[in-house]
Amino acid sequence: MLVWSWRKWPDVLVDFGHQIYTAWRLSTGAVLYTDTDYLMGPLSPYWNALLFRVFGPSFMTLAVANIVLVAILLVLLYRLLARVGRPPATVSACLAFVTLFAFGQLVGYGNFNFIAPYSHDLTHGVLLSVAAIFCLARYHSRSQVRWMAAAGLAIGLLFLTKVEVFVAGSAAAITGLVLTLWVERPGRRRLLRLVGAFVAAAAAPPLVTFGLFSLAMPARRALTQPLGHWRAALRGDIAALPFYGEGMGVGDVGASVWALLAATFGYALILGPAAVLGLMLRKPGRHRPALAGTTFVLVAAGLGLQWRGIAWLEAARPLPLFMLALGLVTLVAFVRRRRDPATAHPLVLRICLIVFALALLLKMVLNTRIYHYGFALAMPATLLLVVALLDWVPGALDRTGGYGPVFAAAGSAALLVAVVAHLSVVDTYFRGKTLMVGRGADAFYADARGAFVNTALEQLRIRAEPGRTLAVLPEGAMINFLARRVNPSPYFHLMPVEIILHGEDHIVAAFQARPADYLMLVHKDTSEYGARFFGRDYGRKIYAWLEANYHPIVVIGPRPLQNDSFGMLLLQRNEGRP
């Protein structure tokens, strides 16, 4: 997957450019939230900035660092899943992570992978959450307070990322802490040590962050931006945007519920007969492995022959139901076995992982998917489903006197065809990335929009003297990074969310205070937010100010923000007219 996807991970204009540009600016001394706007916590941008300071700013610096983090995450996932499942299921789940989530592309835009993500806050948050649960597992093995403190430290760092992953990771860690203490039943002194170590370690990263940012901004502001980034998630006017309603599946609840039930029925149709057969095969004999093999062939052939007619991208919709069912069954088993640490601790870890997976799915509870945001939000649930299909459910059938491998065979066949079907989608998008954008360590493959970006970079080299500043609106900070041109305003990403949060008057004032020498308008249809074009359907005051203060000098392709045609427009500030 790494070789196949090499340099094809990012989107040429959307989201990831925001990430890499912010890291570059911070690596040169800019202050987050003051010199450059940011809606999430400060951990990820400063981590990426540190990488740029040490290894130099480039796309490949960030990509290689993220490949290393993916390897670390893979090891942690394997170690954790190995504690709650048998090796075949664990290996299969890890292969699912590599093939479906880590490197691929299942929608038109890149960015929804762990190498060039739309938000490092999310991918780093997933890693920190898994690390916290892993530290809890180490505590189960060694009973050392330092591992409880390490889990708390991971949660403290997690607070500095993104709100949804913090909620999920902290819910999982706190659940694990409570259940672990229930099993251990420590004395008062040890209880205080364990809880105190966890809480103190969790508090350290936010306190250090507050202290450092207080050196660069008023203390009140340090509380509301680096440490108060979660407040945007509570804004009702933002939550009401169609983008988030559709993403959660509440735009049309009836249709979403129907799609969920239809997908659930599909699972029952495929796996139900295998479960019944497994319950019926109670007598040992050679016929049982033969039937398991036959089941694998029949399911694989049946799905494979009609795979093009199956809505594979809808297959993740029942994940919340599956996680809820697995959680209830595991909780009952834990309550029954809580007095035996040897059997209770694996159940605690299983519950932690299920809580983490289920909490991550809340953002798309009625529209669960492994594409788009699902590359991270649905990843834990998908991996747990793999383990359940190949180990937990077959094990339950074995314990009832049945034959679990026949169910595992059906599950394996379905998973194999599903992975191949998803990889065919990845192949379609990768084949469309044939244009190289950028040079040297900044180079990556892009779709047809890459030709426009290359032309824009060439025009900037021809027309703009070195050191001249550039604003790319409403989105396209990747151009700033590739051209190494600073946007002097903090606001370089003007989607409807940013304009709701900051207000047009405030943004116009910021542009007036620090205007860019050049402006590039890039076509972007934002209909998913309920307003199609910047300057026409939203951001009118900002656009009017731009029109009054800049004049066009070159059009690249069709004029942007007019219709369905993609194009760019380069403008120069009026004061700079020759």
Q: Where are the model-predicted features located?
A:
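Short hydrophobic alpha-helices at membrane interfaces in multi-pass membrane enzymes
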Residues: 135-157, 186-200, 292-297, 347-357
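Transmembrane-helix motifs of polytopic, lipid-linked glycan transferases
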Residues: 64-88, 92-103, 131-134, 279-280
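Membrane-interface alpha helices of multi-pass inner-membrane proteins
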Residues: 147-163, 169-176, 200-204, 299-307, ...
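Membrane-interface transmembrane helices that cradle and orient dolichyl/undecaprenyl
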Residues: 124-150, 180-185, 262-279, 286-288, ...
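Hydrophobic/aromatic-rich transmembrane helices and adjacent perimembrane loops
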Residues: 167, 313-329, 342, 347-351, ...
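Extracytoplasmic catalytic/substrate-binding loops of multi-pass membrane glycan-assembly enzymes
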Residues: 7-22, 32-50, 56-60, 448-452
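Short periplasmic/luminal acceptor-recognition loop of GT-C membrane glycosyltransferases, typified by
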Residues: 39, 425-498, 507-529, 558-563
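Membrane-lumen/periplasm interface segments of specific transmembrane helices
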Residues: 195-268, 362, 419-421
